[in-house]
Amino acid sequence: MSWFKQLWQNSREKGQYYELQAQKYLVSQGLTAIERNYYCPFGELDVIMKDGNTLVFVEVKFRKNHARGGANYALSIQKQARLKRSIYHYLAAKNLTNQPLRIDYVAITGEPSMHINWLKNVF
């Protein structure tokens, strides 16, 4: 086992690490961090950012290599549906109406060196 794999006790820690890397990247691109790991009955919202007045919900996926398309192709139809329901829950819980929003996807591939692919307004 490599030293890199020993950094995490479980997959949740690994996911949180890559969500933080995605958040840092998006901040470097001019977005403002709002919240991470918002949990609700429908699932989790990985990263919530603001781009100007637009609320940006960011789904983060990591894959260590490009097998089966890598992280770029890891967002399933089922995950998209859960993500939408979670966003509706967040908006209702925070009493946000008439809020411009978009859904972005950050695909991170590679371990230990990372390649970040940021896709805006994915669905």
UniProtKB/Swiss-Prot annotation:
This is UPF0102 protein PSHAa2523. The lineage of its organism: Bacteria, Pseudomonadati, Pseudomonadota, Gammaproteobacteria, Alteromonadales. Belongs to the UPF0102 family. GO terms for molecular function: nucleic acid binding. PANTHER family: UPF0102 PROTEIN YRAN (PTHR34039:SF1).
